[in-house]
Amino acid sequence: MTQLADLRRSYVLGSLSETDVAPDPMSQFKRWFDEAVTAKLPEPNAMTLATVDADGQPSARIVLLKGIDDRGFTFFTNYESRKGLDLAANPRAALLFHWVQLERQVRVEGRVEKVSDDESDAYFATRPLGSRVGAWASAQSREVPGRDVLEQREQEYRSKFGENPPRPPHWGGYRLVPTALEFWQGRPSRLHDRIAFRLQPGGDWQIVRLSP
């Protein structure tokens, strides 16, 4: 077995300074995200979403970013899933994007709110038919006796709704409204560049460099 202590690499692809970044973090994120898309990285919109329940127990999972604008970061899920229940109890969360091939990470922290029904309806209508049916068939995060039960539910809802399943009331979007972002660029000798944006009471963003 490979020794974990021997698994390491040097980071040499780029650098990041306070003068390099955009004056607001959303513009900087869009810049880096566009570069990840241009580099044809697999699923550049994949992000780790970390939530905390009412008892302080954290959990994390990979979800897909489905919207980005000046308001924040949008994703969609089952409101009755574990993450949905966590967010109902504690509407604060963190995101992490890791673009390995570019030697970059972006960390995001903030409060989470539900998007409007119109936004959820509009996105749901763009999903493939199987995904729309699956949103009805899966009681996400709950125990299921076997896959056959899940597939039976899928067939039942496919027969019920045909080609036009409506959006389930328990399914929709969230928006993480950021209060802090950090842009990390790998550098040699583990002296990585870390540029952080912190939202100030007046609405401006403070830009600071953090030690690696």
From Swiss-Prot:
Family matches, as InterPro entries: Pyridox_Oxase, Pyridox_Oxase_CS, Pyridox_Oxase_N, Pyridoxamine_oxidase_dimer_C, Split_barrel_FMN-bd
UniProt EC number: 1.4.3.5
Domain of life the protein comes from: Bacteria
Binding site for FMN: 61-66, 76-77, 82-83, 105, 140-141, 184, 194
Co-factor: note: Binds 1 FMN per subunit.
GO BP: pyridoxine biosynthetic process
Pathway: Cofactor metabolism; pyridoxal 5'-phosphate salvage; pyridoxal 5'-phosphate from pyridoxamine 5'-phosphate: step 1/1; Cofactor metabolism; pyridoxal 5'-phosphate salvage; pyridoxal 5'-phosphate from pyridoxine 5'-phosphate: step 1/1
UniProt xrefs under Gene3D superfamilies: Electron Transport, Fmn-binding Protein, Chain A (2.30.110.10)
Residues reported in the UniProt entry to bind substrate: R8, R9, S10, Y11, K66, Y123, R127, S131, R190, L191, H192
Entry keyword set: Flavoprotein, FMN, Oxidoreductase, Pyridoxine biosynthesis
Oxidoreductase is among the record's keywords: yes
Database matches in Pfam families: PNP_phzG_C, PNPOx_N
Coiled-coil ranges (or none): none
Protein purpose: Catalyzes the oxidation of either pyridoxine 5'-phosphate (PNP) or pyridoxamine 5'-phosphate (PMP) into pyridoxal 5'-phosphate (PLP).
Family recorded in the similarity comment: Belongs to the pyridoxamine 5'-phosphate oxidase family.
Stated name of the protein: Pyridoxine/pyridoxamine 5'-phosphate oxidase
